[in-house]
């Protein structure tokens, strides 16, 4: 990690976005984190991929060290931000790997700007986020927003040590390499990110068929907290016919943290088969 670089680029709306980059001569792979995480949470994945790829970890708006505007946290804005970072760094047809919120961002980017990604990989982008069209707001939706607001607010009253201890109690199988960045990301999180709860829904049936690149969905076990169900995976594949689906057993929503070795095996295999074989070269 000593030779990794960090910096800022200006993206959409004049905002500054922080990134870390492994460098090297390999094809570019961009990592898009989930809600409340930041780019540093990808450190173990970046370390594993760095010998073969030029890995770029981006902090989304309101997360990590990127700017945190008061508004603009819809997935459309996040996708435009990520496209801007990719352009500013001069990356050509990068593979984009996104988890949860980052997975939804990656899908929107690939559908809206199909010439940007060389391949996309989605780690448990929630079935709720893949729902087709708009629907009425429900009591369950309102309660979910209230819980999220209370959780984000509660983070600010805890020290790094308290955050790590609390998460370790919930996920004792996570490594220290995961727990440290996880806690750091929560301490850097801006409350403004709660604005994403008021963002309009995405018209997925209209957007997703425009995705032209190879695509992979990595799923896990709903009984352990994974968000994408088998039905949700089938619905997504119906809209993105080239989508490959890889299931990682005994894992929940944070698949890479629960089953790191198997997760990296799946990611490496897809990148080698569908991305490097396409002749993508370093920027």
Predicted regions span which residues?
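Flexible "cap/lid" loop of the alpha/beta hydrolase fold
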Residues: 111, 117-155
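Residue in the alpha/beta-hydrolase core beta-strand immediately N-terminal to the catalytic nucleophile
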Residues: 59, 95, 118-121
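Conserved serine/cysteine hydrolase catalytic core
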Residues: 187-238
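Gly/Ala-rich beta-loop-alpha elbow adjacent to hydrolase catalytic centers
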Residues: 98, 102, 106
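Conserved HGGG/HGGXW glycine-rich cap/lid loop of the alpha/beta-hydrolase fold
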Residues: 15-68
């Amino acid at each position: 990690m000593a030779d990794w670089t960090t910096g800022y680029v200006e993206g959409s709306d004049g905002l500054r976005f922080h990134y870390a980059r492994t460098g090297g001569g390999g094809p570019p792979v961009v990592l898009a984190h989930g809600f409340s995480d930041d780019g540093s949470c990808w450190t173990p994945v970046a370390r594993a991929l760095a010998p073969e790829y030029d890995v770029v970890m981006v902090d989304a708006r309101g997360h990590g060290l990127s700017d945190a505007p008061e508004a603009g946290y819809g997935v459309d804005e996040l996708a435009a931000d990520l496209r801007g970072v990719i352009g500013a760094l001069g990356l050509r047809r990068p593979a984009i790997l996104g988890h949860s919120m980052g997975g939804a961002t990656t899908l929107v980017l690939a559908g809206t700007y199909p010439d940007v990604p060389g391949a996309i990989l989605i780690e448990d982008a929630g079935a709720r986020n893949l729902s087709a069209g708009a629907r009425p707001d429900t009591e369950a939706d309102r309660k979910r927003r209230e819980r999220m607001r209370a959780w984000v607010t509660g983070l600010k009253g805890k020290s790094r040590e308290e955050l790590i201890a609390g998460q370790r109690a919930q996920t004792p199988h996570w490594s220290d390499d995961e727990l440290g960045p996880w806690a750091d990301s929560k301490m850097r999180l801006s409350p403004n990110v709660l604005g994403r709860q008021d963002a309009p829904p995405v018209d997925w049936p209209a957007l997703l068929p425009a995705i032209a690149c190879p695509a992979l969905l990595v799923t896990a076990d709903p009984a352990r907290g994974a968000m994408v169900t088998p039905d949700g995976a089938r619905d997504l594949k119906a809209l993105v016919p080239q989508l490959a689906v890889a299931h990682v057993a005994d894992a929940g929503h944070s698949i890479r943290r629960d089953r790191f070795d198997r997760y990296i095996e799946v990611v490496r295999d897809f990148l080698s088969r569908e991305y490097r074989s396409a002749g993508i070269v370093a920027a």
